[in-house]
Amino acid sequence: MNIFPAIDIIDGKCVRLTKGIADDKTIYQHSPLDMAKTYQDAGFNTIHVVDLDATLGKGNNNQVLSQIRRKIDINIEVAGGIRSKDAIIDKINEGFNTIVIGTFAIKNIDDVLNFDDSLIEKLSIALDIKNNQIASHGWQETTNQSLKHIIDKYNNRPIHSYFVTDVANDGMLSGLNMETFNSIKKLTDKHITIGGGVKDLNDIELSRSNGFNNVVVGKAIYENKISINSLVQFNA
């Protein structure tokens, strides 16, 4: 199992949202690049970076993302507002290792399924769960498509992974909703990254014992609920 520390960015600053609500955010003093360097120096092998401005359709932080990619040597999983094939290719060409797509993957399933293997192998399909439905467009909309329908489609292609977020718990420090995550795990043999609500090391232990591949941790680090050094010990 691996821990992916999260860096969420709005207006060039590190933030954490509560339940995916843009107006309910906490801004932190460290710059995204400083946090990325901290995680690299601590020994993590992957960081999860989200451009929330792009997610919400309010501009982007491309310069910040590019700076992080240039100065950080470890793997970077990038997410946020990546809603076209060209945008995916641009991120790959910049050197990002895994590209997380949600809205585009849900709204344009057939297009994504037809990508060449070399491209689709770089993709993590985001499944943002909100009120038992899949959310899109910065968690502002939900789709009537079932989780099973979407997962069945992508199970037939060599995607990198699924990225599952429990939006209701995200930023709440309320603990992982293992019932939701385990229900998805039953639908696929692909790698799964989970996140949303990690509050302590018990959540990490629970994730490992349930066989999840990666866990994203954000607010629990920023709020000093879990030490960086203790998290690194869980990396495979």
Regions found by a protein language model. Give the residues of each.
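Short, acidic/polar
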Residues: 28-40, 84-89, 142-153
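Active-site/ligand-binding-proximal alpha/beta "capping" segment
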Residues: 64-67, 147-193
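Glycine-rich phosphate-binding active-site loops on the catalytic face of alpha/beta enzymes
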Residues: 93-111, 168, 196-203, 210-230
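N-terminal active-site wall of soluble small-molecule enzyme domains
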Residues: 41, 48-94, 178-182
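Conserved anion-binding
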Residues: 12, 18-23, 89, 96-170
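N-terminal beta-alpha supersecondary unit
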Residues: 14-59
